[in-house]
């Protein structure tokens, strides 16, 4: 692991010190969703502007979502995912064994 400070903490240790398990899990889910959105859009060769036309979600909002600068509503995510041939699904969380 890369050191993030002269004190020797790595990112995982630092993350666990400042966030609780629920916050870490929530952040990981958000990152995975954004990554899937970007990857799907790029694999289809669709620009953010084209996705705006297909989804009805304005390009600046798409950019903010992809940068993780906003927490979009469920309806907005569904509008973005549909033209990419994707949807959301409710599945059990993978929980670390105690």
From Swiss-Prot:
<dbReference type="InterPro" id="IPR001387">
    <property type="entry name" value="Cro/C1-type_HTH"/>
</dbReference>
<dbReference type="InterPro" id="IPR010982">
    <property type="entry name" value="Lambda_DNA-bd_dom_sf"/>
</dbReference>
<dbReference type="GO" id="GO:0003677">
    <property type="term" value="F:DNA binding"/>
</dbReference>
<keyword id="KW-0238">DNA-binding</keyword>
<feature type="DNA-binding region" description="H-T-H motif">
    <location>
        <begin position="48"/>
        <end position="67"/>
    </location>
</feature>
<keyword id="KW-0805">Transcription regulation</keyword>
<feature type="domain" description="HTH cro/C1-type">
    <location>
        <begin position="37"/>
        <end position="91"/>
    </location>
</feature>
<keyword id="KW-0804">Transcription</keyword>
<protein>
    <recommendedName>
        <fullName>Uncharacterized HTH-type transcriptional regulator HI_0659</fullName>
    </recommendedName>
</protein>
<dbReference type="Pfam" id="PF01381">
    <property type="entry name" value="HTH_3"/>
</dbReference>
């Amino acid at each position: 692991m890369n050191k993030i400070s002269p004190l020797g903490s790595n990112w995982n240790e630092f993350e666990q010190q400042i966030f609780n398990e629920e916050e870490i899990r929530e952040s990981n889910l958000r990152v995975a969703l954004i990554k899937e959105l970007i990857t799907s859009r790029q694999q289809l060769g669709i620009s953010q502007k084209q996705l705006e036309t297909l989804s009805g979600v304005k390009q600046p909002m798409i950019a903010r979502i992809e940068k993780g600068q906003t927490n979009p509503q469920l309806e907005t995510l569904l509008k973005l995912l549909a033209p990419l041939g994707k949807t959301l699904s409710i599945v059990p969380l993978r929980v670390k064994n105690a």
